Curated annotation (Swiss-Prot):
It comes from Actinobacillus pleuropneumoniae serotype 7 (strain AP76). Its EC number is 2.1.1.107, 1.3.1.76, 4.99.1.4. The keyword Transferase applies. Pfam families: CysG_dimeriser (PF10414), NAD_binding_7 (PF13241), Sirohm_synth_M (PF14824), TP_methylase (PF00590). In the N-terminal section; belongs to the precorrin-2 dehydrogenase / sirohydrochlorin ferrochelatase family. S-adenosyl-L-methionine binds at residues 225, 301-303, 306, 331-332, 383, 412. Residues 216-486 are annotated as: Uroporphyrinogen-III C-methyltransferase. One of its GO terms (molecular function) is sirohydrochlorin ferrochelatase activity. NAD(+) binds at residues 22-23, 43-44. The modification Phosphoserine is found at residue 128. The gene is cysG. This is Siroheme synthase. One of its GO terms (biological process) is siroheme biosynthetic process.
Amino acid sequence: MNYLPIFVDLKNRPVLVVGGGHVAVRKIYALLKADALVKVVAEKLHSSLQILVNEGKVEWLAKAFEASQVTSSYLVIAATDDNALNQQVFDTAESQQRLVNVVDDQPRCSYIFPSIIDRSPVQIAISSGGAAPVLIRLLREKLEALIPHNLGAMADIATRWRSAVKTQFPQLTQRRRFWEKLFTHQSFQRLTENHQIEQAEALVESELQNNNPVLGEVSLVGAGPGDAGLLTLKGLQTIQQADVVLYDALVSEAVLELVRRDADKVFVGKRAGKHSVKQDDTNQLLVKYAKQGKRVVRLKGGDPFVFGRGGEELEILKAENIPFSVVPGITAALGATAYAGIPLTHRDHAQTAMFITGHLKPDGNRLKWETLAQGNQTLVVYMGTIKAAELSAELQKHGKPSDTPVAIISNGTLPNQQVQTGVLSELAELAEKAPTPALIVIGEVVKLQKDLAWFGKEAVQFVSTQETLWQKPTLQNKETHWKQAA
């Protein structure tokens, strides 16, 4: 981030503008909207600027620039076509530690003006840091069409009723829930759109009098395999309404960035063999936060009902009579294989896809290896790298050919995604080299990966320790290139 987006209170603060042409006029109009005390230094004034001076809205300070004029200024703007003068203004402001903007000259700007969408008192600022002003203009045009014009009226009403709402709801969570309900109320939106402010305020009063106690709830949300673009629309809406988010180790940083800024984020991650938070502790946290009247999101990598223990958590909530909902996510078996170029089913190679986990309960049922070893199917193994040797041996023992194509996808759908391909007899060796989290894919469909890979750089081949019948094993990675001698 090259610039920190901030909003500055310029009311009754002196701002020096050096220049009196049409460029200066544009900046001055914006400054006057913020009630700044604008002082102009220019040899002559644009006709529009002269009118502002005559009306007493702008002070014509002097015709020539002097360093002393900067001393008493809160902000400085240089808007002339004289490069030497602009440089002088910039150097003077910098030496006096005053923020300065030389118009259309980014290297000589300690601050810049963003593009503004004005729904006062609601304002939205957009900037590319000077990198792509045309792109920002196009974006602003799209947002102007999308953002309703009644936002300002809604915000004004909220300002007038803030004190009454705070008295009625002393807890922050209660107030937040009230405002969210009001701002999404169709009648409130319609009344403000039609400028029926008195009726809109009557609705606020009615909602205050009839408001029910705030009830807590829990939403299990699938975060998807990693790429934030794969988070569902409903998932995005849910995490942006949350008061507290309990997230696991498989949720990507990009997805966490989409969580509402003032929500509490609680890490409850665990990995096979490396438990950092016990499942029972996570269950109790869900219950505790919900009973505090909070909107709780349990954010899980992939889909909460695919090896995510989501069902176990809902059973606890059901026993405690806590309302809950589930927002499905794109599971890793779907997302990671798609990004790796491996179709799970194909008429020529696989008519069945099976998902299994390599992390079973110690006293759990054994896997049905006879079924897993059958042909014409794709086997996807979650959390299987630490059991890769056993997986390979058991499948071969029960009839799976040793030259069956396999792939290990690490960090699927993320920029550092890595795909290794080989054959079943080499699975343990491949797993040792694979970063985690990783997904194992076993089946003839892996043959297609070389031709169908589209995400990241082209796969790099390496020499295997043994011959294969279909192709040499490959490693796909944006940054890594390794070879193993025969």
